[in-house]
Amino acid sequence: MRKSRKSTGRWLNEGDAVIIFRNTGQVINHARILDRKFRIETPDLGTIAVDTDSIMSIVFKNLPTYPTDVLRTLGGTELNGTILNDLIRVKAQDLGGTVEIRKAKIISIIW
């Protein structure tokens, strides 16, 4: 008998993420983001802290396509502004364990 699976709204399973680097296009698969929350400063709502478990993707400022950072939640909300987490803690076997990556080096994180 086949088990039914409920969609989580995420592309990857088990909390894994894909990190795409800005200048090189390098991709890290099966990364675990260790930050529990991401804080984003928005022009309309002020500073908001969003649980990492509720985030579907983050695209960091990339002119001209993305004039601000964009955080998308599993609920469909899109927040535009500045992500305040400068260092992002990541655990990935391919990186040799736990590392900190500056947000300026990352173009996007997709869960």
Give the ranges of each region predicted by the language model.
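Compositionally biased alpha-helical segments
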Residues: 1-111
